[in-house]
Amino acid sequence: MPSEIILIAAVTLDGFIARHSSEITKWTKDLPLFKEQTMGHPVIMGSNTFDTLSNELVGREVVIVHRNDDPREILQKVKSQKCFIAGGGKIYSRFYPFLTHLYITPHPYVFGKGVKLFSDIVNEAEVVFENLIQVNENKGIYQYQYKVKQK
């Protein structure tokens, strides 16, 4: 199992990752950073997310998670010491107990409804700030990196 299991997500200010599950996410401004950070590492995602991002994933091992797949079994098959969990909300929730880091990039949008970062209830966890990366200075967009301390 990887020593670093990183949730990576662009979110709106009200905590949504998309307006609906099949949205082609054109509103995010962090795609170049996503590509840089995930290059050479396995990226785990659900099939809807894969459908919306497939053109952006060249050069990466992509693991598509299906409804009945066991997150622990998937992670045990990963040979790399680092992998990224790239959505959607159901996948983030299912892999939540295994996360070691959160890379969250808030964007200046409010959707009001849509796909939440975690579609299911997750347990409380303490997160510790580790790093801040500038994504788009003109729009005030930064990626916040946290270490997760599961309770």
Q: For each of these PLM feature ranges, what is it?
A:
Residues 1-151:
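Enzymes that bind and transform nitrogen-containing heteroaromatic metabolites
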